[in-house]
Amino acid sequence: MRVNVTLACTECGDRNYISTKNKRTNPERVEMKKYCSRDNKHTLHRETK
């Protein structure tokens, strides 16, 4: 079962991306390095509720 998740920047808190994940194979929160336009660099983005 795939669900939509929102990814927020860990440095500025801006919610920049929407992605999907499979809850059965990845029950924990998703973390990805993505580009943050507010910080103008690649930062760690975490799944938010």
Curated annotation (Swiss-Prot):
GO terms for molecular function: structural constituent of ribosome. One of its GO terms (cellular component) is cytoplasm. Signal peptide: none annotated. The keyword Cytoplasm does not apply. Keywords: Ribonucleoprotein, Ribosomal protein. Belongs to the bacterial ribosomal protein bL33 family. PANTHER family: 50S RIBOSOMAL PROTEIN L33, CHLOROPLASTIC (PTHR43168), LARGE RIBOSOMAL SUBUNIT PROTEIN BL33C (PTHR43168:SF2). This is Large ribosomal subunit protein bL33A. It comes from Staphylococcus haemolyticus (strain JCSC1435).
